[in-house]
Amino acid sequence: MAEITKADVVAFIEKMTVLELAELVKELEEKFGVSAAAPVAVAAAAPAAAAEAAEEKTEFDVILKSAGANKINVIKVVRTLTSLGLKEAKDLVDGAPSPVKTGISKAEAEEAQKQLVEAGAEVEIK
């Protein structure tokens, strides 16, 4: 039996009438349990959902981008903020960019950022 290529399928479909194409689409939808119209409706709703999520952000992450010149002071602040041991705090600072605190309130994130910046670190809130 000869192999059917994509080009053969396209050539066959080109010769079909609109009515035959509509019936083919309906049969394919039934056979595979899909709908040809669903992606259009979902794509239209997605941007609205994304906008709502951006407005309702309640949890923030404090990301240490770099320790700057005062690495020791930054390590001290990281230990205070996270209750990590000296080695763990040093590893976190050395591994920048890395998250210092995750899933915290905006006020807490801004306070942590303020303390880290005062110690000489470069910080980002996401």
UniProtKB/Swiss-Prot annotation:
Give the CC-aspect GO terms: cytosolic large ribosomal subunit
Q: Which domain of life is it from?
A: Bacteria
A Gene Ontology biological process annotation? translation
Keyword Ribonucleoprotein listed? The answer is yes
Keywords, A to Z, come to: Ribonucleoprotein, Ribosomal protein
HAMAP family attached to this UniProt entry: Ribosomal_bL12 (MF_00368)
Function, in words:
Forms part of the ribosomal stalk which helps the ribosome interact with GTP-bound translation factors. Is thus essential for accurate translation.
- Name of this protein: Large ribosomal subunit protein bL12
Please report the organism this UniProt entry assigns to the protein.
Trichlorobacter lovleyi (strain ATCC BAA-1151 / DSM 17278 / SZ) (Geobacter lovleyi)
